[in-house]
C-alpha cells in the first residue's frame, strides 16, 4: 500500500517540485491532496488522514508551525515534514518544538526531501524514536 501524502504550500512552484520529486522517487508515495494555505491543509488532512503532511512554514491563514501543532493534536499518527526557505537554527527549533518530525530546507529540497521521508517512515515502522531528521541529519547533530 502506498504512503499517502498531503502537500501544503502557498507557492504553486514548490507544490509542483514536491509532486515531481515524489513521483520520480517511486510508486510507494502518492499525493492524495494539495493545499495552498494552512486552513485548507488542515481540513484536507482531517478528511483523508494521510500518513504524511509536507507543509511550508509560512502560509496564509494558518502557518506551518500552527498546522503542525493541530495535526499533532488531532491526527497523532500523521507524520509532518516542515519545509522552509528559512534556514536559521531558530526556525529549525520552532519546527521541532511544534512537533514536526522533519525540517527540510527548500534550498536543498531536491536532494533531501525523499531521503528524509524514507528515514522518517523507516523509523516509524521499526518502532524507533530517534531524533527528528532535519535537512538529512539528526537534530542532535545539528545542535
Range-by-range predicted roles:
Residues 48-54:
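Active-site beta3 strand of CheY-like receiver
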Amino acid at each position: 500500500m502506498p504512503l499517502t501524502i498531503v502537500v501544503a504550500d502557498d507557492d504553486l512552484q514548490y507544490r509542483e517540485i514536491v509532486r515531481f520529486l515524489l513521483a520520480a522517487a517511486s510508486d510507494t508515495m502518492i499525493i492524495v491532496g494539495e493545499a495552498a494555505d494552512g486552513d485548507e491543509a488542515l481540513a484536507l488532512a482531517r478528511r483523508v488522514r494521510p500518513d504524511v503532511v509536507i507543509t511550508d512554514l509560512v502560509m496564509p491563514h494558518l502557518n506551518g508551525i500552527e498546522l503542525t501543532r493541530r495535526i499533532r493534536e488531532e491526527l497523532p499518527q500523521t507524520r509532518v515534514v516542515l519545509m522552509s526557505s528559512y534556514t536559521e537554527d531558530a526556525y529549525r527549533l520552532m519546527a521541532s518544538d511544534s512537533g514536526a518530525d522533519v525540517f527540510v530546507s527548500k534550498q536543498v529540497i531536491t536532494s533531501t526531501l525523499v531521503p528524509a521521508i524514507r528515514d522518517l517512515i523507516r523509523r516509524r515502522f521499526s518502532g524507533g524514536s530517534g531524533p527528528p531528521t532535519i535537512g538529512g541529519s539528526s537534530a542532535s547533530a545539528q545542535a
